[in-house]
């Protein structure tokens, strides 16, 4: 991406409180340092019209993000987990030069807040030192991995590091004692929803030291993201759009017809590998990590 394609904007705030309790990722605040994302994942929900983002390939940098974050963390009455990676990837290629995410982690460490990073990038391993420091309070890194097939991953997530590179970064973090795992989502119906697909991801996650794997055996599509997904998937898998439209119509949640079997296999597999299907969360009382179940 050329420098002239990047906008600089001034934000009014940097942390947004979730309206309801997050029992899946354990996040209380969302933090987005950038607007838009360079990874170009064809299934990205951020393209949905309801968010009002527009062209997500147009990247905007929040120039006052770190100043705002420092102030907001200073004035919070209690500590709760900050999540980053929901609307864009905090480790998109631009981060390598701008180091905005690293700057945010330095402030999170300074104020002793817990953090949960969700990413598709191996660049997160660069910040292992800070994540170790934050881990004294609570730090989790979840790698989104949809397939172990690097060629397929490149088609679905064209500008993101390969799945192999993500697993290598996961191993680096887990070897340093950082709590890490996999967000196995989305699982695209008729594309990467076989038992073999799930087995390969879970086994590689175990080899890389994952403590958990969080699955979703389907994909969410709504106005804005659906049209883009169909346009791109048709070029990769001709006639796949017709299959989706026939099977799912205009449903928001497009769950794999194999979901029941995948779910049963998944839970049996992770049990044999000693991996959990839910995360341990930060808890302010005594700063303990609590599991959902």
Regions found by a protein language model. Give the residues of each.
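Active-site glycine- and acidic-residue-rich loops that bind
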Residues: 122-125, 189-199
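Conserved Radical SAM active-site core
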Residues: 1-142, 146-154, 163, 167-168
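Short histidine/acidic/glycine/proline-rich micro-motifs that form metal-
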Residues: 89-91, 187-190, 252-253
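Short beta-strand segments at enzyme active-site cores
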Residues: 82-83, 118, 180-184, 213-217
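Conserved strand-turn element in the central/C-terminal portion of the radical SAM core barrel
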Residues: 148-150, 157-159, 172-194, 217-220
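Auxiliary Fe-S-binding modules of radical SAM enzymes
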Residues: 1-10, 16-19, 195-293
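A structural motif
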Residues: 112-113, 178, 210
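Surface-exposed amphipathic alpha-helices with a cationic face
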Residues: 132-135, 167-175, 267, 271
């Amino acid at each position: 991406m050329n420098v002239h394609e990047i906008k600089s904007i001034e934000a009014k705030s940097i942390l947004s409180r979730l309206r309801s309790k997050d029992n899946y990722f354990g996040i209380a605040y969302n933090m987005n340092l950038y607007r838009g994302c360079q990874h170009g994942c064809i299934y990205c929900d951020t393209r949905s019209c309801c968010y009002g983002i527009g062209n997500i390939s147009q990247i905007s940098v929040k120039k006052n993000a770190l100043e705002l974050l420092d102030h907001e963390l200073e004035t919070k009455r209690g500590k709760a987990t900050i999540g980053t990676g929901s609307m864009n990837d905090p480790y998109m290629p631009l981060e390598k030069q701008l180091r905005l995410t690293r700057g945010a982690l330095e402030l999170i460490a300074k104020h002793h807040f817990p953090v949960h990073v969700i990413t598709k990038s191996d660049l997160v391993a660069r910040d292992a030192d800070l994540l170790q420091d934050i881990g004294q309070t609570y730090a989790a890194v979840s790698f989104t991995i949809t397939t172990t097939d690097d060629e397929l991953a490149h088609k679905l997530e064209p500008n993101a590091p390969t799945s192999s590179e993500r697993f290598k970064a996961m191993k680096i973090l887990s070897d340093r004692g950082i709590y890490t795992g996999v967000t196995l989502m989305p699982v695209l119906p008729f594309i990467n929803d076989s038992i073999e697909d799930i087995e390969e991801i879970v086994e590689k996650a175990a080899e890389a030291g994952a403590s958990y794997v969080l699955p979703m055996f389907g994909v969410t599509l709504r106005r804005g993201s659906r049209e883009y997904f169909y346009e791109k998937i048709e070029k990769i898998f001709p006639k796949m759009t017709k299959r989706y439209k026939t099977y799912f119509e205009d449903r928001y949640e497009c769950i794999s017809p194999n979901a029941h079997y995948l779910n049963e296999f998944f839970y049996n597999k992770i049990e044999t590998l000693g991996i959990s299907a839910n995360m341990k969360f930060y808890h302010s009382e005594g700063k303990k990590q609590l599991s959902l179940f």
